[in-house]
Amino acid sequence: MAKHRYLPMTEQDEKEMLEVIGVKSIDDLFQDIPEKIRFKRDYDLKPAKSEPALLRELSKLASKNANTSEYASFLGAGVYSHYIPTVVDHVISRSEFYTAYTPYQPEISQGELQAIFEFQTMIAELTGMDLANSSMYDGGTALAEAAMLASGHTKRKKILISGAVHPESINVLKTYATGQHIEVEVIPEVDGKTDIDVLKKALSDDIAGFVVQYPNFYGQVEPLAELEKLVHENNSLLLVSSNPLSLGLLTPPGEFGADIVVGDSQVFGIPESFGGPHCGFFAVTNKLMRKVPGRLVGETVDENGKRGYVLTLQAREQHIRRDKATSNICSNQALNALASSVAMATLGKTGLVEMAKQNLDKSHYAKQKFRENGFEVLFSDGFFNEFVVKLSKPIKEVNESLLDEGIIGGYDLGFYDAKYEQHMLVAVTEMRTKEEIDAFVASLEGVK
């Protein structure tokens, strides 16, 4: 009989399997692990609980979390509290989507492939690019993959990246670049934007591309037109990491001449979930189509002339070319991409613009309230839904006290950059009300 209720392998099964591979016991399988680091104590597990008792205990533990359904959140820095239409969970919970993996057999995967195709189409339209892929793991890895593409396309081994890009994305890029022997140089920011004078001096004939965030980590809108001219005059690629919601109002990077646009679609239909999983996107111009990482779904017709969808240009991919592939990403975030697609389709063009406008209006209202109450707000007013406020106490302490008032405070910028100690990055989305914004400003009155 089976040793464990939910593990169907019996003792006889175990014995036969060990005999086939030529070992006497399970312990023999771990002989490569040094004896001194093996765990040999009792697990000291508590007695089993009934399901109702277990649910009560887990609910008690979960209640310690500060969640955005009960707290007013002003935390952003790449992950945001946005409205998720109720239809999103209903659609993505359908079994034909929820269990689907990479649809290699198009004849039995038309629904999944069409959903991915629609995601690609919406991302391409938002970014102003020619095409987009089926998704990436997240915005950070999409950015790193874009840099790898730029290096491979230009045959150059150096990437410049703005210091106003999210610090975690910079770290992901550096990790990718190490294995590919690509040099990464960070161009410092000044007044919350890329230092263009430093960029001009850094551009040379060994630069594959320049990475900029739009809006950037500090919420500021970078001058893409000026950056595009500098980068392309150097025959390098312009790589833009963008918040797709902001593109409901801002001019799309593609219209400025960006070569690659990446980002994270978490803002559409995907909860914060402690930072992931989310959904990266990757959009390019036609000239880079055959070098795009990940899956591409294309529209075609079958032998009867009916419209159909297939995975296309697969010779780029690692399951075909192995070490010669354009990338070693071997999957996508199809379920989360579907969530974003449903959210965007539900909002529609008018709703998406309205959602973006509420982010802009409410964040600028909050900025004005801070200034009226004597707070120092840094940088220009050219921001989308995030801005920086200087306080007189460590942000960690401030945020702990805010929790007692039912508020999740902004991001502690000193975590990554000492010069921004006691500076809070405040995010204001469409979810925040005037009353919540006023209460937030009032709660910080003692630390301005």
From Swiss-Prot:
GO terms for biological process: glycine decarboxylation via glycine cleavage system; nucleoside metabolic process. It catalyses: N(6)-[(R)-lipoyl]-L-lysyl-[glycine-cleavage complex H protein] + glycine + H(+) = N(6)-[(R)-S(8)-aminomethyldihydrolipoyl]-L-lysyl-[glycine-cleavage complex H protein] + CO2. Disulfide bonds: none annotated. Keywords: Oxidoreductase. Its EC number is 1.4.4.2. GO terms for molecular function: glycine dehydrogenase (decarboxylating) activity. The keyword Oxidoreductase applies. It is an enzyme of class 1 (oxidoreductase). It holds the Pfam family GDC-P. Gene3D superfamilies: Aspartate Aminotransferase, domain 1, Type I PLP-dependent aspartate aminotransferase-like (Major domain). Belongs to the GcvP family. N-terminal subunit subfamily. The glycine cleavage system is composed of four proteins: P, T, L and H. In this organism, the P 'protein' is a heterodimer of two subunits. The glycine cleavage system catalyzes the degradation of glycine. The P protein binds the alpha-amino group of glycine through its pyridoxal phosphate cofactor; CO(2) is released and the remaining methylamine moiety is then transferred to the lipoamide cofactor of the H protein. This is Probable glycine dehydrogenase (decarboxylating) subunit 1. It comes from Listeria innocua serovar 6a (strain ATCC BAA-680 / CLIP 11262). The gene is gcvPA.
